[in-house]
Amino acid sequence: MTRKNNDEIKFDHHHDGIDRRGFLKCMAWAGTGALCVIEGGVLKSYSLSNPFSMKRHAGRELSFVQISDSHTGFNKPANPDVVATLKAAVDKINALPVAPEFMLHTGDISHLSRPEEFDNVDQILKAARPKNVFFVPGEHDVLDDDGKTYRERYARNSMGAGWYSFDMKGVHFVGLVNVMNLKAGGLGTLGNEQLEWLEKDVKHLSKSTPVVLFAHIPLWTVYPEWGWGTADSAQALSYLKSFGSVTVLNGHIHQTMQKVEGNVTFHTATSTAFPQPKPGAAPSPGPMKVPAEQLRSLLGVTDVKYARGHHPLAVTDSTLE
């Protein structure tokens, strides 16, 4: 990796960890936030501390924000006040230089699927500048009644267990569900019915259409020993091989990770509630207690921008500090 100037980091493809299959993996800098743009297979990252890096990407045609893993109802030592940090996330969204047009919430809205937990999130999100919110469930949102309460609130017009798609300013968005019937430590699954629907959903699209998939559990294998992956994600992604630009946004692992494979950029978001250990750094995943003064540096939101005619989507991770 080589540093070109004070705000741009350009990856050297001879020394950046791309293996013979063309994978690129990078971890975002904890506590700083980074603006990542993929152009011609080159990943460029800009420090959020430099306002000029943000201005270069202002004025794009479509801007939206991803939040994840609010876990309202959680009150353990890893974060005894998840409501306060969710409110801080909304404040961060409202302070973005370009107002997002909508939000994606990639699941674990609640901690125990209780109505009052969903109520808290709904009330807090009303204060956000973007008023439209699109949800997919996390496993904590479907603990009871096979997810019926979740679907009645957030997915009334969806298919199956809550999957759906929509179009916005030339971008096709697909919300997927990979948390049903999840076993402890097991991989997520999409299932045949949802896969068949996805194949039909994208078949009619022009191959130049940018596609954004969003689901709770990563659609790439981050760490199978902890269930951080989706067993049948390869089948889903096979339907998108001929598209020029595919972005996959996930949550679940409570930390920012990114991988580029061919035409697909994978990105996982931090939580607004609590961090989890890095893969393999602890005996098991779960809420990780850190010194109170460090907590907000490990929580955050993700801002995504797209300009028509430009395939790369700019993905910005901001901490709650």
Task: Indicate residue ranges for each PLM-predicted region.
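N-terminal secretory signal peptides
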Residues: 1-19
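N-terminal active-site segment of His-dependent metallophosphoesterases
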Residues: 11-12, 26, 43-119
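N-terminal export leaders
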Residues: 19-42
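Extended active-site neighborhood of metal-dependent phosphoesterases/phosphodiesterases
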Residues: 48-52, 56, 114-210, 232-247, ...
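Active-site neighborhood of phospho(di)ester-bond hydrolases with catalytic His/Asp-centered motifs
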Residues: 67-68, 103-107, 134-139, 214-215, ...
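Surface-exposed cleft-lining segments at the edges of enzyme active sites
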Residues: 74-76, 109-110, 179-190, 220-225
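Short, well-ordered beta-to-alpha junction loops that form the rim of enzyme active sites
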Residues: 177-178, 214-219, 251-253, 318
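Short acidic, glycine-rich surface-loop motifs adjacent to enzyme active sites
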Residues: 206-222
